[in-house]
């Protein structure tokens, strides 16, 4: 049994991951915003499935720190796995998003991950072990027009998590990026749209493309061959079952759109960079000996 903290567990991938891992007998703490408010019913449902709901808003330092303290207090100071899942999506003409909208996007998708890592890593370093699974996207490797700002936040995670993996390898902490394709979750139902519709209107026919893309995507999600979002929970469970030191640094889930090829092509280049810096030893995680 492992102790796991999952962010963004009120719906979508996060909720499915929480329920899947709890069913496997793990001690799961499901991070949920407004746990006693609009998500009270969801919290009760998670609890019924064997997970422990924890109030957690990744955009607030105090909330993140309190959630990690609660987990450590309830588990006797143990935390084995952190799943960075909380995220929001955006779609539209990039110029028509305001700076405040982009800031909100990065606040959740990037800064939220940094908050969780700062809160959890001291425990992982002290233990000499830990696994951080971050839900990225294939759009952190390839670019879809009109999804560029969302993609930018996921590209940021790629560099961020790579650096953390090197820096924490000798402390026995592993990092894996899960890169899902498009799946029917409520993240798309609540996708961030441009606040400056007038600016988007200046693009004419091109400005109408994202709406058509979105309609096509929704049609695919509602069709008989819609991709199964449970694929992501299964990928996370498989990573957890893989022995320490043998996990891949990236896993593409669903239709790759070339992201898998990009991963394979970039890996030797990155290795050359690290070798050139004389830091090859940081590329291999130091696995804690079994007691």
Where are these regions (language model features)?
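Active-site helix of classical SDR
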Residues: 117, 153
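Conserved glycine-rich Rossmann-like NAD(P)H-binding loop of the short-chain dehydrogenase/reductase
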Residues: 24-40
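SDR active-site lid
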Residues: 170-247
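The beta1-alpha1 cofactor-binding region of Rossmann-like NAD(H)/NADP(H)-dependent oxidoreductases
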Residues: 56-69, 99
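Conserved glycine-rich cofactor-binding loop
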Residues: 10-11
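Residue(s) in the substrate-gating loop at a strand-loop-helix junction
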Residues: 137
């Amino acid at each position: 049994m492992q102790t796991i903290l999952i962010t963004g567990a009120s719906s979508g991938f996060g909720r499915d991951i929480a329920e899947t891992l709890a069913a496997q007998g793990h001690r799961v703490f499901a991070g949920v915003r407004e746990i006693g408010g609009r998500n009270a019913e969801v919290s009760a449902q998670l609890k019924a499935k064997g997970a422990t709901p924890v109030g957690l808003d990744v955009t607030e330092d105090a909330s993140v720190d309190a959630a990690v303290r609660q987990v450590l207090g309830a588990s006797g100071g143990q935390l084995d796995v952190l799943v960075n899942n909380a995220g929001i999506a955006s779609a539209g003409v990039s110029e028509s998003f305001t700076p405040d909208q982009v800031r909100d996007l990065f606040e959740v998708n990037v800064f939220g991950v940094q908050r969780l890592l700062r809160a959890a890593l001291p425990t992982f370093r002290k233990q000499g072990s830990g696994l951080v699974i971050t839900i990225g996207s294939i759009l952190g490797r390839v670019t879809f027009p009109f999804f560029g700002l969302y993609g930018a936040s996921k590209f940021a995670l790629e560099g961020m998590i790579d650096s953390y993996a090197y820096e924490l390898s000798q402390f026995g902490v592993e990092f894996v990026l899960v890169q899902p394709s498009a799946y029917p979750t409520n993240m798309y139902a609540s996708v961030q749209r441009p606040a400056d519709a007038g600016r988007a209107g200046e693009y004419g026919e091109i400005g109408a493309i994202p709406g058509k893309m979105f309609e096509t995507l929704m049609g695919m999600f509602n069709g008989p061959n819609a991709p199964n979002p449970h694929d992501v929970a299964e990928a996370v469970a498989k990573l957890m079952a893989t022995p320490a030191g043998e996990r891949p640094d990236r896993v593409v889930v669903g239709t790759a759109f070339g992201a898998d090829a990009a991963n394979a092509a970039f890996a030797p280049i990155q290795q050359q960079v690290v070798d050139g810096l004389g830091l090859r030893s940081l590329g291999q995680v130091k696995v804690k000996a079994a007691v």
